[in-house]
Amino acid sequence: MAQTVVLKVGMSCQGCVGAVNRVLGKMEGVESFDIDIKEQKVTVKGNVEPEAVFQTVSKTGKKTSYWPVEAEAEPKAEADPKVETVTETKTEAETKTEAKVDAKADVEPKAAEAETKPSQV
């Protein structure tokens, strides 16, 4: 059964759009999809399960959530004529670079482990 899945995806550049385009282009059951970087909105149509689409797009490393239902009920403005389906032209190495996640950990010393100096008398 064909259905439409709408996601909010954190995309800030054409590289982000390319990563989402790549994974959706390979996904089985997808008939069409639209990527709107301005609204950070991805609309997927086809014989797909919403959770499967969500998981597939999440694999790009982009922050992904379901599009809010109340926003979907609002009347839609005319589609931007400049929005088009983007074809993948990046090399595999460039794509892998985009998928890397910055893994900086915030490390704070615990109060009990804080360095103390003996008082001088």
Swiss-Prot record:
Organ and tissue specificity: Expressed in phloem (at protein level).
Q: Does the keyword Lipid metabolism apply?
A: no
User: Basic and acidic residues: which segments have biased composition?
Assistant: 73-121
Question: Region entry Disordered: which residue ranges?
Answer: 70-121
Q: What does this protein do?
A: Involved in copper homeostasis. Can complement the yeast mutants atx1 and sod1.
Q: Which residues are listed for Cu cation binding in this entry?
A: 13, 16
Residues in domain HMA? 2-65
Q: Which species?
A: Arabidopsis thaliana (Mouse-ear cress)
Q: Which domain of life is it from?
A: Eukaryota
| Modification N-acetylalanine occurs at | 2
Could you tell me what this protein is called? Copper transport protein CCH
Name of the encoding gene: CCH
Record's PROSITE patterns? Answer: HMA_2
Q: Does the keyword DNA repair apply?
A: no
Family designation? Belongs to the ATX1 family.
One GO CC term on file: chloroplast
The free-text cofactor remark is:
Binds 1 copper ion per subunit.
Keywords carried by this UniProt record: Acetylation, Chaperone, Copper, Copper transport, Ion transport, Metal-binding, Transport
Which is a GO BP term held by this UniProt record?
intracellular copper ion homeostasis
